[in-house]
Amino acid sequence: MAKEVAGLIKLQIKGGAANPSPPVGPALGSKGINIMEFCKQFNARTQDKAGKILPVIITYYADKSFDFVIKTPPVAIQLLELAKIKSGSAEPNRKKVAEITWEQVRTIAQDKMVDLNCFTIESAMTMVAGTARSMGIAVKGEFPGNN
């Protein structure tokens, strides 16, 4: 018989750096989840992604047990790392802070394909390019899907 799901918690935590302090502790403690057990499991599964911000979806059950799924880093974070900038533009339509190529957009789209709500790499690329535009990052060249 399946366990009764009590709820979901969505967090963004640095890989290999989960600890009981906020935001992890209060979010899990208020639901009665063993905070230290989650931190140990999360840190063990994300050792190879240390320092990267990772979205995690925690499913907790009525018996206070839990499961969690680790997603790929958000597109915005990947774009900031790729462009080597700390933040996007305050005025993205007027002031561009960096440039990337369509090949770099394709790389991010392929990485995020499992988490995005699309079926083709071209549609994933347009989503990534839209995020880049909204951050003030220009995409150089012609969209490769316009052949």
UniProtKB/Swiss-Prot annotation:
GO terms under cellular component: cytosolic large ribosomal subunit
Annotated Pfam families: Ribosomal_L11 (PF00298), Ribosomal_L11_N (PF03946)
SUPFAM superfamilies hit by this protein: Ribosomal L11/L12e N-terminal domain (SSF54747), Ribosomal protein L11, C-terminal domain (SSF46906)
Changes after translation: One or more lysine residues are methylated.
CDD domains: Ribosomal_L11
Record-level GO BP terms: translation
Record-level Gene Ontology MF annotations: large ribosomal subunit rRNA binding; structural constituent of ribosome
InterPro entries according to UniProt: Ribosomal_uL11, Ribosomal_uL11_bac-typ, Ribosomal_uL11_C, Ribosomal_uL11_C_sf, Ribosomal_uL11_N, Ribosomal_uL11_N_sf
UniProt keyword annotations, A-Z: Methylation, Ribonucleoprotein, Ribosomal protein, RNA-binding, rRNA-binding
Signal peptide, first to last residue: none
Functional note: Forms part of the ribosomal stalk which helps the ribosome interact with GTP-bound translation factors.
Annotated family: Belongs to the universal ribosomal protein uL11 family.
Assembly with partners or alone: Part of the ribosomal stalk of the 50S ribosomal subunit. Interacts with L10 and the large rRNA to form the base of the stalk. L10 forms an elongated spine to which L12 dimers bind in a sequential fashion forming a multimeric L10(L12)X complex.
The protein's name in its UniProt record: Large ribosomal subunit protein uL11
